[in-house]
């Protein structure tokens, strides 16, 4: 055996085993006669990594069912996916190598393993990627981890199996949580509030947004440049969490800014919609995700739906929870909360313009004539039209409306046969003015009946004629 171990590079001294692994009689349970296979067993026993057993994973009775189900229920798809991805790797990092089988044809899905010629099976309650199966024993009351190295052929052609048992440590779930903090597969990814990968339009960038340069600089300084200088900020005792509110009428580019930032930042992005924050516990869940994924840009659209002024609102536990999170009761270094609202005057005063919560409120007003000219040029690819005239006619219209006017003008050109040799619409002043008149006389005037005067520019669906 010594010679074989030396030939295969197996260390003479046993490596330190994990405290929750029992190994006293491990080799005695391996009934193998052939030296080469026994040597494989010793390599496995001493933790040698030079052998690739190509095993699946079967965990038997690893957690009690209630604890793991409660854990996943509290964290929705996000934690479920993190568990799927990290648990097999976590076990492998501890030296666990396991195999078994499961029978999906059975109504309850039965997992099976073999322990010293005794079949063990249990009802599966979780089945994960990479072959990880969690189930409860039905025939063996001891909480054991069954390890089987199957289909190992020695040079004589015989098939051997190696069986070993581990006692399970009660703290292993906590150890796994610590493991995921360093190996979270979502870190650096762009996800939504339920843990799904975002499908962002990669063409949206700050180059596609028409806003005053000064305003864009403020936004970039508090987001892109902030994430790029965290080490320097920390050295100078600058708070490494930020809260920013983008306010203004609908259609003025708030969501476009959020999407551009999501595309351009090189950190994790968590994009949250009102549907992701229905309960107080959802606020806590979202911020736990952001902290785990930090550095992270947390985008919350339409934050006014849960932060209404308490003088005019009966109260909402979500508001209190949000204030607690922003106050930094928990460490939130590296988390920027970027929120949007069309109704900033309705947002609770204790939230907005409050250092430590939302430090900046950036108002994005309706575009002035210079910005409207720039928008028309951008949306029309510098077509030969009188931009000052059409921009004046589009007074008090948002960027979204101006874009719609340009789309309508192109449609009018196409249906009238005004296209160039490259099949591109030839837009002229008449088409633009007709589009503006069509919108102003019908859709826009109808919209103004149902919205406050200070919300002119509110986006409404085009009225069918």
Q: Where are the predicted features?
A:
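C-terminal alpha-helical "lid" subdomain
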Residues: 354, 365, 369-465
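Hydrophobic side chains in well-ordered alpha-helices
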Residues: 169-176, 257, 375, 405
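Walker A/P-loop NTP-binding motif of AAA+ ATPase domains
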Residues: 206-392
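AAA+ P-loop ATPase mechanoenzymes
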Residues: 2-228, 460-465
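Generic structural signal for secondary-structure transition and capping sites
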Residues: 185, 228-231, 295, 327, ...
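Residues at alpha-helix boundaries and the short loops/turns that link adjacent helices
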Residues: 49-52, 56, 293, 396, ...
């Amino acid at each position: 055996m010594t010679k074989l171990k030396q030939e295969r590079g197996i260390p003479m001294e046993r490596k330190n085993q994990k405290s929750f692994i029992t190994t006293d009689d491990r080799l005695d349970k391996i009934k193998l006669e052939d030296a080469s296979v026994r040597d494989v067993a010793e390599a496995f026993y001493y933790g040698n990594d030079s052998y690739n057993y190509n095993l699946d994973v079967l965990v038997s009775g690893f957690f009690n069912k209630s604890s793991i189900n409660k854990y996943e229920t509290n964290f929705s798809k996000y934690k479920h996916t993190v568990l799927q991805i990290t648990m097999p790797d976590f076990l492998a990092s501890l030296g666990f190598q396991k195999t078994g089988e499961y029978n999906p044809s059975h109504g309850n899905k039965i997992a099976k393993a073999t322990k010293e010629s005794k079949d063990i099976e249990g009802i599966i309650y979780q089945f994960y990627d990479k072959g990880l199966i969690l189930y409860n024993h039905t025939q063996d009351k001891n909480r054991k981890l069954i390890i089987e190295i199957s289909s190992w052929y020695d040079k004589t052609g015989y098939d051997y199996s190696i069986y070993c048992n581990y006692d399970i440590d009660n703290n292993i779930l906590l150890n796994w949580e610590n493991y995921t903090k360093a190996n979270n597969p979502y870190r650096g990814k762009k996800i939504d509030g339920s843990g799904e990968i975002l499908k962002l339009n990669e063409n949206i960038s700050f180059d596609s947004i028409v806003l005053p340069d000064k305003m864009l600089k403020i936004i970039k300084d508090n987001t892109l440049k902030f994430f790029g200088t965290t080490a320097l900020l920390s050295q100078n005792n600058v708070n490494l969490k930020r809260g920013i509110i983008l306010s203004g009428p609908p259609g003025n580019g708030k969501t476009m800014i959020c999407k551009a930032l999501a595309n351009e930042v090189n950190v994790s992005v968590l994009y949250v919609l009102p549907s992701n924050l229905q309960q107080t516990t959802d606020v806590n869940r979202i911020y736990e995700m952001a902290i785990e994924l930090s550095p992270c840009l947390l985008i919350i659209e339409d934050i006014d739906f849960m932060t209404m002024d308490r003088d005019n609102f009966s109260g909402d536990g979500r508001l209190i929870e949000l204030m607690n999170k922003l106050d930094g009761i928990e460490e939130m270094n590296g988390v920027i909360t970027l929120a949007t609202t069309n109704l900033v005057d309705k947002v609770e005063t204790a939230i907005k313009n409050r250092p430590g919560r939302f430090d900046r409120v950036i108002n994005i007003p309706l575009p002035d004539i210079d910005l409207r000219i720039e928008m028309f040029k951008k949306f029309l690819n510098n077509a030969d039209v009188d931009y000052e005239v059409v921009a004046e006619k589009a007074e008090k219209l948002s960027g979204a409306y101006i874009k719609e006017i340009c789309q309508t003008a192109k449609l009018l050109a196409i249906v009238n046969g005004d296209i160039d040799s490259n099949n591109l619409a030839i837009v002229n002043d008449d088409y633009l003015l007709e589009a503006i008149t069509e919108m102003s006389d019908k859709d826009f005037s109808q919209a103004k009946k149902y919205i406050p005067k200070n919300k002119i520019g509110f986006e409404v669906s085009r009225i069918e004629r």
